[in-house]
Amino acid sequence: MRSNSVNIETFKDMLKRYEDFKMKNKREPRVIFIRSGGGESIPLETFRDMVRRYNNFKDRYGREPRIVYVTPPEPPVPEVNENTPEYVSITQFKDMLSRYNRFKEVNGREPRVVFIYSGGGPSVSLETFKDMCKRYNQFLEENRREPRIVYVTPPEPPVPEEVREMRRVLGEFKTATQLYTLVSRRCKYKFYYNDQTPNREALKKMVTDGINCTDACQLFKPVIEGLGYSVRIEHVKVRCNDNKWYGHYFLRVAGKELASVSLPSERWTVWDYVSATKTGRPLGAPCCSRGIQHLGWGIVSPKHD
């Protein structure tokens, strides 16, 4: 069959033809055609199973299904089973690769799972095995030698200290957007000129006395970079509600859910500590909305890098 399912209208037509045949011939048909007039058909046993699953669905959900599978779909294969090791030796990996290739050659298709050891036992899904092969080939290309081991699933990268320390103060976050939300709820702004506070001290002051835009940029840049984003500090002038221009610093961030890294830096997403803590503006908006002038990148004569 070209498809493993039929829509509900086709199934009910099959059911009607099955009942008509039984009534007319006093027996069940050996096969049931998918469509009236001939063509593709299924055995009686398969059709009975379709009827059973159709009735089960109606009893359970109080409505008809939109489709009925000819044969029930196979359950999803877990990525790894509970006994699967964290990694395999290069010898073991190459044995898995050999068995995978042999299966393809013999059966004309890929296996649903690849066993870690010949003869059964722990296994990985086809998708996981393909990822193992991709990482093996990348290592080979980059290092011009085979790895000693291949991880079944890649290990989590170590969390940078700056991210760990920020999570200790603000709580859990995984993205720059989530971090911005936490900053808007927990942190404070304090006006003063230039950068005056080392990062370790600023980490404490941001939730007590408050810090300014310069110290905030120096504090949050390595944190957001540690989450996997590209970050630059932009030096600007902003015009506020009093129509005066003020010097200001904020972050431009790209990657993941924010602006694309392929865009020029001046089009990356604005991540402004003062917007979050003082003026209550959303992520992507600078603290003042009456005007903005770009002055440069990075902090002028920083005291605390």
From Swiss-Prot:
Pfam families: Peptidase_C71 (PF12386), PMBR (PF09373). Residues 3-34, 39-70, 87-116, 121-152 are annotated as: Pseudomurein-binding repeat. The N-terminus contains a cell wall binding domain. The endoisopeptidase domain is at the C-terminus. Optimum temperature is 71 degrees Celsius. Optimum pH is 6.4. Monomer. Keywords: Antimicrobial, Bacteriolytic enzyme, Cytolysis, Host cell lysis by virus, Hydrolase, Protease, Viral release from host cell. GO terms for molecular function: peptidase activity. Its EC number is 3.4.22.-. This is Pseudomurein endoisopeptidase. It comes from the Viruses. The active site is at residues 213, 248, 272. One of its GO terms (biological process) is defense response to bacterium. Belongs to the Psimunavirus Pseudomurein endoisopeptidase family. PsiM2 is a defective prophage of methanothermobacter marbuggensis. It comes from Methanobacterium phage psiM2. Cysteine protease that cleaves the cell wall of its host methanogen under hydrogen limitation of the latter (autolysis). Cleaves the epsilon-Ala-Lys isopeptide bond in the oligopeptides of pseudomurein. Its cofactor is Ca(2+). Activated by Ca(2+).
